[in-house]
Amino acid sequence: MKFLMKKCVRCGRYTFKDVCPVCNGQTTVPHPPRFSPEDKYVKYRVLAKLTKERPSSEGSTLSS
């Protein structure tokens, strides 16, 4: 599925272009992925999101 609308990472404006016309920042798709209760990889996405938000100076290791 192709999404038309994109959101600028820098300024947060919405546009239809790949580069923001206001600040020349990179744009991404603002829509979340589709939810499926049978998703096998949700564990890995949540883990990646949590480690991305957590400061790396803690030095803790995550195990499954």
From Swiss-Prot:
GO MF annotation list: snoRNA binding
Keyword Nucleotidyltransferase: no
Descriptive protein name: Ribosome biogenesis protein Nop10
HAMAP family: Nop10
Organism (species): Ignicoccus hospitalis (strain KIN4/I / DSM 18386 / JCM 14125)
Keyword Cell inner membrane: no
GO cellular component terms attached to this protein's record: ribonucleoprotein complex
Gene3D superfamilies attached to this UniProt entry: H/ACA ribonucleoprotein complex, subunit Nop10
Annotated function: Involved in ribosome biogenesis; more specifically in 18S rRNA pseudouridylation and in cleavage of pre-rRNA.
Keywords recorded for this protein, A-Z: Ribonucleoprotein, Ribosome biogenesis, rRNA processing
Example of a GO biological process term: pseudouridine synthesis
Signal peptide start-end: none
Similarity comment: family membership: Belongs to the NOP10 family.
InterPro entries reported in the protein's UniProt record: H/ACA_rnp_Nop10, H/ACA_rnp_Nop10_sf, Nop10_arc-typ
